[in-house]
């Protein structure tokens, strides 16, 4: 019941949070909730867990497991634990990934809401601020929401404010991302292409291709 009340509160906050979005200022806590809502909507529509995804090494099950596992880490790292300490606290995921998503999405959101924005978090590559970690996590869930939508044939359009915010994270790093090997090569698109298409293109995704 507590989780259900929280979910209703999250949806209401996302709706009202849009009214507070102005210019280049982004309320990343609201965007985290919106990103999780985007993913949850697609997850609820999954019927074929073996379907391929735009992440060519993953099927739908693998993709969902990755996103859920990322949420498992959030409360541990925000509590100040090292990677080794956090890893010891992580439980293996169960077979019901929809239920696991609900559990760990809730826990992650509660942890984000309670975290001090300027506190430092130990990640695999550096110590960063809570705010930087939050932006990274919002961006990851947003992109994978599109991946999941494409994989299952669900609506692919993401929330406009979410896309605009993630663009401010990825666009300044386009050269770094291209050189990282984490993504396929960027897809060339004209400057007047939709912002979501250009965002996806930075990560090597081409939404013009047939699903």
What is each model feature region?
Residues 3-17, 21-31, 35-56, 73-93, ...:
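Structured surface interface patches that mediate subunit assembly and partner/cofactor docking
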Residues 63:
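Extended, alpha-helix-rich binding/interface surfaces that flank or overlap catalytic cores
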Residues 68, 98:
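A conserved catalytic-loop motif detector
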């Amino acid at each position: 019941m507590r989780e259900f009340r929280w979910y209703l509160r999250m949806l209401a906050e996302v709706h009202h949070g849009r009214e507070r979005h102005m210019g280049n200022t982004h309320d990343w806590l609201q965007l985290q909730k919106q990103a999780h809502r985007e993913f949850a909507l697609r997850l609820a529509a999954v019927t074929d867990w073996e379907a391929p995804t735009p992440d060519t090494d993953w099927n739908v099950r693998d993709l969902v497991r990755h996103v859920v596992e990322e949420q498992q880490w959030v409360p541990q790292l925000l509590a100040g634990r090292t990677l080794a300490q956090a890893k010891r606290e992580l439980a293996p995921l169960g077979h019901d990934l929809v239920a696991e998503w609900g559990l760990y999405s809730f826990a992650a959101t509660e942890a984000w809401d309670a975290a001090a924005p300027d506190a430092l978090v130990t990640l695999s590559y550096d110590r960063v601020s809570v705010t930087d970690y939050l932006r990274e996590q919002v961006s990851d869930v947003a992109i994978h929401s599109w991946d999941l939508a494409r994989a299952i044939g669900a609506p692919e359009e993401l929330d406009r404010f979410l896309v605009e915010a993630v663009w401010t994270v990825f666009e300044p790093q386009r050269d770094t991302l291209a050189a990282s090997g984490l993504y396929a090569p960027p897809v060339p698109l004209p400057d007047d292409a939709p912002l979501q298409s250009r965002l996806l293109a930075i990560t090597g995704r081409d939404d013009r291709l047939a699903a």
